[in-house]
């Protein structure tokens, strides 16, 4: 019992660290915009992340030796390319959006993908639980408070990040479609490579990248690439093993809260030049969005009132 409890505690802390790394990555993404075009940042960051995951794959397969699972390369490459397309769309929209909105707002809007995933199940002829629609309604109210201006307009950055959440939901559903038949690390490496190559092409066409830009923003690039993509992904794999999926999802949801706090701290200490302070109305919106995200992840049996177990 103690060993199981210790393992659960350890894995929970690992996922909390992962959520912290990913939440703080929004700060590095925002900082990177001071030095280079969004395509440049996204391209270099993704290639760094792909390299980090490749190292993890090589080490883990070397340790496994003859016990390493045989790969269906054709299927893994197909899944990686398809997931890479949606990842490219999602991460590009997010990176452009962060340029025009605050770190905290970007963090909370991005987490809406957690609600979109079960909602979009309707297109796959899956039954959507009533609680999902309730969460969607709450999220809409939260989004209104968080993003709507006095002139009843949404900011360009908020719209881009909202579309990014939709793209992330589709990307996650694509991964889920192949999950049982692929190696998650291999597919992740391929999809980051696809994203990196496509964004680097976009940077060459639109961003006019220079070595000086990359050198000045190297700290932000390394954090977003090595820690957020490489280390964060590896920690997620380790932390989720043997942990209750609901607990894991709830811990990972803290990414949005951490993004808001880290963005505010980064502004206060002068690391970010754009004001990251949220108004009371926006904070209320954040709370409602977060509550909706939590609600949609709770076990279905929690909502079966009046039913006795057989």
Q: What do the predicted segments below correspond to?
A:
Residues 2, 46, 61-62, 217-219, ...:
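C-terminal-most transmembrane helix of multi-pass membrane proteins
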Residues 53, 128-148, 168, 199, ...:
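Hydrophobic transmembrane alpha-helices of multi-pass small-molecule transport proteins
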Residues 10-18, 66-93, 138, 156-164, ...:
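Loop-to-transmembrane-helix transition segments
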Residues 52-57, 113-134, 257-281:
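C-terminal transmembrane-helix exit sites in multi-pass transporters
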Residues 25, 54, 60-110, 143-145, ...:
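Specific transmembrane alpha-helical segments of multi-pass solute transporters/efflux pumps
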Residues 39, 53, 117-118, 123, ...:
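Transmembrane alpha-helical segments that form core, pore/gating elements
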Residues 19, 44, 106-112, 175-196, ...:
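Helix-helix packing/entry segments at the starts of transmembrane helices
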Residues 1-43, 85, 89, 93, ...:
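Glycine-/small-residue-enriched transmembrane alpha-helix faces in small-molecule transporters
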């Amino acid at each position: 019992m103690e060993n199981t409890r210790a393992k659960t505690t350890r894995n929970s802390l690992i996922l909390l660290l992962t959520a912290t790394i990913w939440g703080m990555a929004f700060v590095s993404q925002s900082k990177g915009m001071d030095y280079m075009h969004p395509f440049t940042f996204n391209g270099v960051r993704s290639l760094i992340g792909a390299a980090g995951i490749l190292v993890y794959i090589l080490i883990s397969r070397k340790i496994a030796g003859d016990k390493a699972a045989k790969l269906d390369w054709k299927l893994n490459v197909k899944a990686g390319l398809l997931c890479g397309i949606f990842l490219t769309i999602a991460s590009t929209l997010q990176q452009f959006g962060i340029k025009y909105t605050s770190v905290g707002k970007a963090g909370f809007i991005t987490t809406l993908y957690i609600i979109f995933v079960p909602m979009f199940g309707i297109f796959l002829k899956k039954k959507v639980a009533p609680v999902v629609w309730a969460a969607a309604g709450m999220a809409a109210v939260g989004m209104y408070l968080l993003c709507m201006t006095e002139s009843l307009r949404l900011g360009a950055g908020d719209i881009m990040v909202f579309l990014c959440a939709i793209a992330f939901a589709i990307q996650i559903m694509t991964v889920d479609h192949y999950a049982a038949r692929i190696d998650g690390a291999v597919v992740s490496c391929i999809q980051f490579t696809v994203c990196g190559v496509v964004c680097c092409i976009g940077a060459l066409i639109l961003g006019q990248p220079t070595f000086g830009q990359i050198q000045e923003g190297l700290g932000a690039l390394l954090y977003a690439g090595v820690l957020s993509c490489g280390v964060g992904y590896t920690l997620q794999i380790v932390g989720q093993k043997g942990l209750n999926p609901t607990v894991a999802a709830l811990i990972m949801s803290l990414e949005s809260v951490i993004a808001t706090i880290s963005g505010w701290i980064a502004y206060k200490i002068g690391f970010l030049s754009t004001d990251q302070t949220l108004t009371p109305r926006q904070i209320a919106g954040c709370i409602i969005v977060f509550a909706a995200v939590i609600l949609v992840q709770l076990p279905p049996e929690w909502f079966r009132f009046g039913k006795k177990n057989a």
